[in-house]
């Protein structure tokens, strides 16, 4: 065990003080966000997540008092294009500047009251909107449709404008509406359920996926341009109550220094962004991770459990959210696979990391903070 500095509120601290854990005496929290309720109800396979100290909703429901995630069609009237149709179909206006913010907020009230019936909801509250990004320049590849459709809207009203004039106006209209849509959504959510830890999934990201370009020379570092772009999202960090970056690992990164660097850089950028808002404290960071390699049901190796869960704890994150989809409870075989994984490598490792975080907090921080690495690029771990 390497002794790490304590993240707490001393007067001379270079870092902002951290908020208290959302669960008492749990400086590092591991939460479950997967629809696994059918494993027990349909197949008689109990996962017993509580036995490993994993925070889970009642009956392992996907949405509940501890963790709730809203997808694009579950909160208000989110505008987007259905890319699967030819030509793409606009839903709720398609682009944010072509949508009704008031109608969206009105529907959103009903959705939150239905999904979060308790006014005292104090769990993780995650909004997963991935169809478009609020910065115009980041709408590349399939998301380029939001730039092209925005330009069409401008050209329709200004047929004599040059392409440059159209693009400048389209960018301004899109970003202005995107900011309003995302920030007003957070404001309303926080007013309705003020104790919830509201934030957007995948924010921040630093787009350090270039391991495909030069695997051997991959450093993991976030491109400086993307760091600058994250700084432009200060309005979003000011409205967020928590940050939910993703540290999903593809199998190509298995058991490699590149995988450790990939995750480490994402965590470092999220923790940097957490310091940017004007609040006295830093924002809590809960990194979304998969216990399996992305797009598979292949278990993370022991080394990659360390590179994800262990590294998040050592870096100073508030916790990890283990995400899964309907495949987890698709059949008895998948449920049994998850149970065996929990009993084998995953569950004991979660216990190890959370206990190490508790002990370090008690002995180094006197129970009033979280241990974290002295240097973001360090490879020190809590266990």
Where are these regions (language model features)?
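N-terminal carbohydrate-binding/catalytic regions of secreted carbohydrate-active enzymes
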Residues: 38-115
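Aromatic-lined carbohydrate-recognition surfaces of secreted/lumenal glycan-active proteins
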Residues: 166-229, 263, 278-294
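A solvent-exposed, charged loop/short amphipathic helix patch at secondary-structure junctions
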Residues: 88-95, 139-175
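Aromatic-rich peripheral "rim/lid" segments of glycoside hydrolase catalytic domains that contact
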Residues: 307, 311, 323-375, 380
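Alpha-helical scaffolding within the catalytic cores
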Residues: 53-56, 110, 222-234, 265-274, ...
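N-terminal signal peptide
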Residues: 2-26
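Glycoside hydrolase catalytic-domain groove-lining segments
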Residues: 232, 236-239, 244-294
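Conserved, mostly hydrophobic/aromatic
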Residues: 127, 243, 312, 320
């Amino acid at each position: 065990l390497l002794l790490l500095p304590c993240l707490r509120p001393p007067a001379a601290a270079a870092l902002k003080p951290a908020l208290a854990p959302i669960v008492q005496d749990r400086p590092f929290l591991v939460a479950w966000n997967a629809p696994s309720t059918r494993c027990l109800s349909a197949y008689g396979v109990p996962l017993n997540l509580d036995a490993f100290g994993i925070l889970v909703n009642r009956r392992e429901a996907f949405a509940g008092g501890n963790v709730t995630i809203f997808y694009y069609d579950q909160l208000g009237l989110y505008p987007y294009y259905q890319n699967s149709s030819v030509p793409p179909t606009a839903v709720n206006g398609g682009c944010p500047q072509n949508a009704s913010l008031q109608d969206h907020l009105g529907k959103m009230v009903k959705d939150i009251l239905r999904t979060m019936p308790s006014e005292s909801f104090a769990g993780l509250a995650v909004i997963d909107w991935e169809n478009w990004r609020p910065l115009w320049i980041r709408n590349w590849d399939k998301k380029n449709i939001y730039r092209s459709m925005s330009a069409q809207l401008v050209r329709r009203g200004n047929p004599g404008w040059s392409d440059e004039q159209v693009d400048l106006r389209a960018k301004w209209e899109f970003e202005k509406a995107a900011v309003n849509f995302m920030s007003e959504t957070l404001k309303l959510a926080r007013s309705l359920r003020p104790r919830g830890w509201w934030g957007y999934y995948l924010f921040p990201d630093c787009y350090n996926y270039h391991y495909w370009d030069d695997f051997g020379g991959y450093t993991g570092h976030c491109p400086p341009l993307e760091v600058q772009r994250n700084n432009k999202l200060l309005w979003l960090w000011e409205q967020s109550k928590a940050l939910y970056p993703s540290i999903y690992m593809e199998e190509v990164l298995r058991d490699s220094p590149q995988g450790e660097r990939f995750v480490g850089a994402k965590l470092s950028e999220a923790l940097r962004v957490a310091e940017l808002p004007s609040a006295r404290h830093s924002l809590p960071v809960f990194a979304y991770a998969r216990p399996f390699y992305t797009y598979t049901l292949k278990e993370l190796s022991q080394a990659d459990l360390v590179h994800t869960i262990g590294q998040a704890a050592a870096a100073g994150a508030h916790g990890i959210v283990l995400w899964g989809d309907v495949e987890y409870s698709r059949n008895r075989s998948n449920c049994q696979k998850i149970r065996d994984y929990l009993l084998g490598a995953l569950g004991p490792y979660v216990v190890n990391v959370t206990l190490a975080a508790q002990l370090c907090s008690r002995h180094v921080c006197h129970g009033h903070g979280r241990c974290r690495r002295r240097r973001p690029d360090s490879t020190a771990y809590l266990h």
